[in-house]
Amino acid sequence: MVSRPHGGRLVRRVLSGRRREIFESQYREMPRLEVPLERAIDAEDLARGVFSPLEGFMVEDDYLSVLSRMRLSNDLPWTIPIVLDANREWVLNEGVSAGDDIILTYHGLPIAVLTLEDIYSWDKGLHAEKVFKTRDPNHPGVEATYKRGDILLGGRLELIQGPPNPLERYTLWPVETRVLFKEKGWRTVAAFQTRNVPHLGHEYVQKAALTFVDGLLVHPLAGWKKRGDYRDEVIIRAYEALITHYYPRGVVVLSVLRMNMNYAGPREAVHHAIVRKNFGATHFIVGRDHAGVGSYYGPYEAWEIFREFPDLGITPLFVREAYYCRRCGGMVNEKVCPHGDEYRVRISGTRLREMLGRGERPPEYMMRPEVADAIISHPDPFI
């Protein structure tokens, strides 16, 4: 049976019925807070159950608890703060206080109604140190943190409409994947998180997981990324080619997850597992340096952190780095291959980008030709 939502209940906070009628009659007089795309995406993820059991942006008690203990104030595992920032000037000018309804807008488009419960300040340096394990502004997550407002607003929200989504036809929300898995008769599902196009190492890991479960959820992230990352549509196109040509029919669900990437390493690995639990996954594939960037985290820190959460409710699958062994004649890892480094060919993401950027097909021991062609055919595959 697919996993229960985190906290036991799948959140759904979409404005409807009488509440929507009231909103439509009063919204012109309500205070408005213009938010960037990242917060608009957070709002929709909150409302559609991606971040269950959260029903809105964190109040201070939950925020501080997550920062210090990696658990909500009710002791439920949670590792990444989901917070809404604002400038102090906006708070003073609008005169908002607890109990007020605030419209969150993106490019003027009403996205959600926030019922304000808490207004509090935060220490961005401490936040960076706890979440990212560094205060270095060169870390993309730290840099983004320092650019945010100096006040945080907490409270439950109701979605009016999500921000425009160019990948909507590829997007399934938790309530939809759960129905789909049930229709397929899947009792166990492994989820694979990615922000890259697939090479043979990814395929090796996914198929290893498929050996033990009924189905695979390939769940590429669409949202804020850093320069040099693959474009969302390129990742989808590449995975469609891989699944069509190299997977049995009916064992893989490909769905885009529109969620922000924090590059928070170990903490984010647990966060990604919790999110996939809400989608119904029973297992989550955790790779080497999961959600890492640069050299900020050790290669297997993302494995070690799971020991702190025996009550997580989803099984992590720790997969070793795959490489091509000339002696074995295929993709292997260090646990099953006895041969030395002179036989090992590691797949370099940087080298793949360089080759694909020049319009070259990588060697077939690195990437399937159909996948390479899907990427090369795009006029501008990188952000």
From Swiss-Prot:
Catalytic activity: sulfate + ATP + H(+) = adenosine 5'-phosphosulfate + diphosphate
Protein name as annotated: Sulfate adenylyltransferase
A Pfam cross-reference name: PUA_2
Xref: NCBIfam families: PRK04149.1, sopT
CDD domains for this protein: ATPS (cd00517)
EC number: 2.7.7.4
GO BP annotation list: hydrogen sulfide biosynthetic process; sulfate assimilation
PANTHER family: PTHR43509, SULFATE ADENYLYLTRANSFERASE
Protein's organism: Aeropyrum pernix (strain ATCC 700893 / DSM 11879 / JCM 9820 / NBRC 100138 / K1)
Protein family (similarity comment): Belongs to the sulfate adenylyltransferase family.
